[in-house]
Amino acid sequence: RYTLAAGRTGTLYGIRADYTLVFFNNPDCGMCERIRAEIVASPLLSEMIRAGRLEVLALYPDEDLTAWRAHAPQVPSSWINAYDAGARISKEELYDLKAIPSMYLLDRDKRVLAKDAFEVGYIECLLDRQPQ
């Protein structure tokens, strides 16, 4: 479960797209900014987002909501920008986050295609090889 700025919640299973890219990030993380820029600059990912085939969930797994809210304008409006209320991800070890940033690529049924990825090129290669 994730929480949006207005307080509304959602789940991964509520995301209706062929693929979901869960991008775990922190507001003051330089590497996170680089990866965000690479996702935005990727012709493949941009086209898939535009076509509704890929949804990006930018998920902040920590509890400093002041920093997260201040950083929100930097996240593209076409992405879901959310945080983990109560820091359940880390407390309950819902994801094996070895480092931030990290990306998980999920298919339509939310099966994991990539875990702990930190290279946008790797995500592009995986998506490029998937059946249309």
Regions found by a protein language model. Give the residues of each.
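N-terminal "domain-start" segment that seeds a small globular fold
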Residues: 1-14, 125-128
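Short active-site neighborhood of thiol/selenol oxidoreductases, capturing the structured segment around
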Residues: 10-39, 55-59
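Hydrophobic beta-strand positions
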Residues: 1-2, 24, 105
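Structural microenvironment flanking redox-active thiols in thiol-disulfide oxidoreductases
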Residues: 33-73, 87-93
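Non-catalytic, surface beta->alpha helical segment in thiol-disulfide oxidoreductase systems
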Residues: 98-132
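Short, internal strand/loop/helix patches
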Residues: 69-104, 108-109
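Short acidic-hydrophobic, aromatic-tinged amphipathic segments that line or gate anion-handling sites
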Residues: 2-4, 80-85, 116-117
